[in-house]
Amino acid sequence: VGFKAGVKDYKLTYYTPDYDTKDTDILAAFRVTPQPGVPPEEAGAAVAAESSTGTWTTVWTDGLTSLDRYKGRCYHIEPVAGEENQFIAYVAYPLDLFEEGSVTNMFTSIVGNVFGFKALRALRLEDLRIPPAYLKTFQGPPHGIQVERDKLNKYGRPLLGCTIKPKLGLSAKNYGRAVYECLRGGLDFTKDDENVNSQPFMRWRDRFLFCAEALYKAQAETGEIKGHYLNATAGTCEDMMKRAVFARELGVPIVMHDYLTGGFTANTTLAHYCRDNGLLLHIHRAMHAVIDRQKNHGMHFRVLAKALRMSGGDHIHAGTVVGKLEGERDITLGFVDLLRDDLIEKDRSRGIYFTQDWVSLPGVLPVASGGIHVWHMPALTEIFGDDSVLQFGGGTLGHPWGNAPGAVANRVALEACVQARNEGRDLAREGNEIIREASKWSPELAAACEIWKEIKFEFEAMDTL
């Protein structure tokens, strides 16, 4: 046929509505808002082209490869209900386009270049279907839910955590003291805040030492296994690994990483080290809202959550649901299930666009954290179930009597809710009553109930379908 130079419509090559997707394809659902006058097929094809083999003009070197084998294909387009100029474009990518075991490469391909594309007003990646063939090239979470429970010897209830506040400004010794008080009071974990790295007022090594001392002391006194998420996030991968190695030498059970600001390459490196050395890995999602908060541009958090399960982490922050809207509850539980379960069926009412089979990748514990306190405990226990971590920062340290009583109040509230649930009571309906009953024999809980009885965070949810 010979080479024909010039610009031709993307849809002639990249829009293939009769394509049958393969079991090995990576499938993506994009919410596309084209510029006025750009037809949906062209916009969808442009996304497929620019995120795979295409460029703005035909090139001579196209003839040196098999485009049919390597090109992304826009295979289906559907309008978004209630939106005038918006639709979901489904794109299939051949597996050969991606490096094995690299979340970094997967994202660079699928979302690396196409979001600045002029023909689109906005673009959002709503969901990905990762085929088992690709998942098998990833290690995934270092340990997973069952192994974590066995390491900690804690079963049949959610785990309790607390972020140490004020997050910045404490000396290492005072920080360790707060850790000890919380763990001694009954929490399972305490946590470095995401931006606690190694600052002038508290260098990382001092913090690690005092926190390790605190958790061993609390362990000896309570007879329970305790942990503190030591944040290993650093300016270079080498420094990050140095911190993880020191944590292992101290014999602590868990370290932490900010996976979006730290980057997927660093995160996967750390996850591999954690599995090889028996460390649990707690993941904080700092910066996620920059990417996922806008409804029509960016990436939904469920995609970032899937990427984390591939890259590796044993816990990840996943919102709280409580005090927000019902619609948001279904969507949050959608990606919570994506983190925990082995197989998740397609369910558009929960924002899940594809059936996802995780084959052998362990599950991740969702962490509920942010503005929660003892009155939320029944709802949190009901919504998240046993396989979760409930984290109360201010809800522990803000107790009028101090840190340890704050921890006691949370532990009593949790045990009361779990017992009530196991006895068949309805936490959604009887939650307040259950907390009131428990507070009669726990002065710490009674004081917490009194101080937070009026607090509400009532804003409309951003994350709706």
Curated annotation (Swiss-Prot):
GO biological process, one term: reductive pentose-phosphate cycle
N6,N6,N6-trimethyllysine PTM sites in chain numbering: 4
Post-translational modification: The disulfide bond which can form in the large chain dimeric partners within the hexadecamer appears to be associated with oxidative stress and protein turnover.
Major subcellular location class: plastid
Positions bound to substrate: 113, 163, 167, 285, 317, 369
Class in the EC hierarchy, top level: lyase
Cofactor(s) it depends on: Mg(2+)
Pfam families linked: RuBisCO_large, RuBisCO_large_N
Subcellular location: Plastid, Chloroplast
EC number(s) reported in the record: 4.1.1.39
Enzymatic reactions: 2 (2R)-3-phosphoglycerate + 2 H(+) = D-ribulose 1,5-bisphosphate + CO2 + H2O; D-ribulose 1,5-bisphosphate + O2 = 2-phosphoglycolate + (2R)-3-phosphoglycerate + 2 H(+)
Binding site for Mg(2+): 191, 193-194
Textual note on the cofactor: Binds 1 Mg(2+) ion per subunit.
Feature type site, description Transition state stabilizer: 324
Keywords: Calvin cycle, Carbon dioxide fixation, Chloroplast, Disulfide bond, Lyase, Magnesium, Metal-binding, Methylation, Monooxygenase, Oxidoreductase, Photorespiration, Photosynthesis, Plastid
Active-site annotation: 165 (proton acceptor), 284 (proton acceptor)
Stated role: RuBisCO catalyzes two reactions: the carboxylation of D-ribulose 1,5-bisphosphate, the primary event in carbon dioxide fixation, as well as the oxidative fragmentation of the pentose substrate in the photorespiration process. Both reactions occur simultaneously and in competition at the same active site.
NCBIfam families: PRK04208.1
Family: Belongs to the RuBisCO large chain family. Type I subfamily.
Subunit-structure text: Heterohexadecamer of 8 large chains and 8 small chains; disulfide-linked. The disulfide link is formed within the large subunit homodimers.
Protein name, as recorded: Ribulose bisphosphate carboxylase large chain
Gene: rbcL
